[in-house]
Regions:
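Feature marks short, highly hydrophobic, charge-poor N-terminal signal-anchor/signal peptide-like helices
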Residues: 1-15
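Core hydrophobic alpha-helical membrane-spanning segments
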Residues: 16-22, 106
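Transmembrane-cytosolic junction motif
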Residues: 20-46
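Charged, low-complexity intrinsically disordered regions
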Residues: 38-67, 72-210
Length: 210
C-alpha cells in the first residue's frame, strides 16, 4: 500500500496524468469546434451535413451542390477512398484519417493535373512562367499546357497564395480532388478551399481541348 501511495504521488506520475487530461480536453474541444465549423458551413452553403462510420469513429461529411457543381467534403480513412489511386500517388495505404474534397468536372478522358505547395531551395523549375507560382508550388499536368493556363487565370492566381502546406490537388478521371492528411478544424480555411477548388474546376473546364 505504501509503495502504491509513493507511486501515485510521484511528481512524474502526477505530471503525466495532468498532461493526459489536458491532451484529452484539447482533443474534445477541437472536435466540438470542428463540428460547429462544419455545421456553420452547411447552414451558409446549403450543403448537407452528416456523419459516416469509419474504422475509428463517426467522421463528418458535407455533400450536395455548391456553385452548380457536385461536391463532397469528407473525413475518411483508407477504406473510404480508392486505395489503388492513393497508393500510386502517395505510396501508402492511408491508415490515418484524411480530409478529402471532391468536385465533379466535365473534361475529356486523360486530362490530369497535380498541384501542391512546396519549399523550394535554389532555382525553381519553370512551369507557368510566373516566378512566385513556380517557386512555391510543385506542378505537373497532361497536357503540359494545362497547368500554366489554369494557374495563371485571374481567380485562381489571386487565391493560390492562401493554399497551405500539406494539401495535394489532383485532376483525374473527371474529378478534382483535394486531399490533406488529418482533419481540418478551421472553418474559414475550409470555406476558402471550397471557393478556390470551385474556381480551379471552372478554369480546368473552361480550357479548350483539341
Amino acid at each position: 500500500m505504501n509503495k502504491l501511495l509513493e507511486y501515485i504521488t510521484n511528481p512524474l506520475f502526477l505530471a503525466l496524468i495532468v498532461f493526459l487530461v489536458l491532451l484529452l480536453t484539447f482533443n474534445i474541444l477541437q472536435r466540438l469546434g470542428r463540428g460547429r465549423a462544419w455545421k456553420q458551413i452547411a447552414a451558409e452553403t446549403g450543403l448537407q451535413f452528416s456523419k459516416h462510420r469509419t474504422a475509428t469513429y463517426r467522421d463528418q461529411q458535407l455533400s450536395g451542390i455548391y456553385r452548380e457543381r457536385s461536391l463532397a467534403l469528407i473525413e475518411s480513412v483508407s477504406e473510404e477512398y480508392d486505395a489503388d489511386r492513393r497508393r500510386s500517388e502517395r505510396g501508402d495505404n492511408r491508415t490515418n484519417t484524411d480530409t478529402d474534397i471532391r468536385l465533379k468536372i466535365n473534361v475529356p478522358q486523360g486530362i490530369k493535373m497535380k498541384l501542391n505547395r512546396v519549399i523550394t531551395i535554389g532555382e525553381a523549375t519553370r512551369v507557368t512562367g510566373n516566378a512566385e507560382i513556380d517557386r512555391h508550388f510543385n506542378i505537373t499536368s497532361e497536357p503540359d499546357w494545362l497547368a500554366p493556363k489554369v494557374l495563371t487565370s485571374a481567380n485562381v492566381r489571386q487565391k493560390l497564395p492562401r493554399l497551405k502546406m500539406g494539401g495535394n490537388i489532383f485532376v483525374q478521371e473527371a474529378e478534382l480532388l483535394f486531399n490533406q492528411l488529418g482533419r481540418i478544424s478551421d472553418g474559414k480555411y475550409l470555406r476558402f478551399l471550397l471557393d478556390f477548388l470551385s474556381d480551379l474546376a471552372d478554369a480546368v473546364e473552361g480550357c479548350r481541348y483539341g
